[in-house]
Amino acid sequence: MADKMQALGAQLTQALQETDEFKALKAAFATMKEDDATYKLFKRFQQIQMDLQQKQMAGQQVTDDEMSRARDVADQVAKIEAVKTLMDAERGVNALLNQLNQTITQPIQDIYAG
């Protein structure tokens, strides 16, 4: 049974890559990456987010300075058109994945609703 699930997962991976949403995300990322300054700022933003998340997960308090720095970088990133396009594309893929997750988990929801 696990092999069947793995095979279905591989098929879903392929199907996802063929969707317009995924293609838009891939193109938006490539466009954003072409501008070196934008890409570096985007990577910095990702790193700051990851650092803050890890700190919170470890039960550590995020300082006001860290939050201020994160907001500053987020504000800079949000003003860049290529990043806005990337974020829109991410929302499209996330919506698709949320729909898929609902479909997959419906039998589990049915068990608890029953």
Swiss-Prot record:
Listed Gene3D superfamilies: YheA/YmcA-like
Disulfide bond entries: none
One Pfam short name: Com_YlbF
InterPro entries (UniProt xref): Com_YlbF, YheA/YmcA-like_dom_sf
HAMAP family: UPF0342 (MF_01526)
Family the entry assigns: Belongs to the UPF0342 family.
Protein name, entry field: UPF0342 protein LVIS_1488
Natural source organism: Levilactobacillus brevis (strain ATCC 367 / BCRC 12310 / CIP 105137 / JCM 1170 / LMG 11437 / NCIMB 947 / NCTC 947) (Lactobacillus brevis)
